[in-house]
Each structure stands twice: as C-alpha cells, then as structure tokens.
Amino acid sequence: MQDWVIIDTETTGLSAPIYAVEIAGQRMRGLEPIGQPFHAFLNHQVDIPPAAQRVHGYSRNFLNLNGSAPLVAHREFMGYVGNALISAYNLPYDYDKVLVPEWRRLGIEPPLPRGFCMLRLTKKLFGSSPANDFKLQTLREHFRLPERDAHSALGDVQTVVDLLRVVLLPQLQKTGLSKPGP
C-alpha cells in the first residue's frame, strides 16, 4: 500500500504573493497515521498582514523567533514527503496556490504526483453539507470531533485525519468504497 501525506499550510493571506508561514503533514498508510507528523514555521522576512495574524496568530516577531529559513524548511518537508502523494483538505489552495509558487520562488522542483482533495471528496460524499458549510472547523464541531488547535497547520492536519477516519470512512463504506487513499 502506497503512503500518502495529508498536508496543511498557514499563510500570509489569500492574495499573491502568498508565503507559507507554517507547514504541517501527517504520513498515512491506508487510513492509519504512521510516524510523527511534520511541522515547521517559516520565516520569509515579510510582513504578516493583520488579517492573517488574526486567523492564525503568527506575527513577524513570532516567526523571527521560531521560524526556519524557507529553503531549509521546504527541503525538510520534501524529505518527509518523499515520493508519497500529497493530499490536503483544500488541495487547490494549499498545493497549487501556496506551495507550488513558493517552491518555484525557491528554485525547488514541485513533486509529482499530487494526491486528492479532501474537501472535494467530502462534497462528493455528502452532496449538501451536513452542517451549514464545508469549512473544516464547522464539520469538526458538527461531527463532535476532538478540538485541535484550529487555524494552525498541525491542528488542521490532525482534524483532517479525524474527519477521514470517523466521518468519511463510514460514508465511503456506504457507497461500497472503503479506501479513499491511493
């Protein structure tokens, strides 16, 4: 069974250029997390807009004290991912809009292949939202999943693992499928 990695990022915002200020990942084998998660703060030496700070709480001062050089953090992340598929709750954002442009700025070749989008899978399985919307934290509250550190990359990765194992797997089994991973 091929390993895959659930990833998440926290960023400087939604408008380009977008810089990752935190990256997290959890290696999976089937539906089981294996090993320790990956986690890194990145210090790009750029200002963090107040709106982004309100979401994740990371200031430029915090990143100056706790962040790694982006090239170092991304190389460590690539080492963690290896040849596994990369999946995320919102893959088009985390992978296509955040990581790929950042890797190109740093001269890193984006890994292939990318995996699947958990948000898209969730929408396909449920059709309409079982909660008010498909936001990760809304679903976490609706399905009474453990409270994690919301709007931190590591907390969101852990919430996606919970959502996958507790909510999506039973839905997949109802459709006759049992393995959403590669």
PLM features: residue spans?
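Conserved non-catalytic scaffold segment of RNase H-like nuclease domains
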Residues: 1-113, 133-147, 151
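Acidic two-metal-ion nuclease catalytic site recognized across multiple nuclease folds
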Residues: 2, 142, 161-182
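Ser/Thr-centric signal marking residues that sit
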Residues: 9-12, 118, 159
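Short alpha-helix plus adjacent loop in nuclease-associated cores
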Residues: 115-132
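Conserved catalytic/binding loops enriched for acidic/polar residues
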Residues: 156
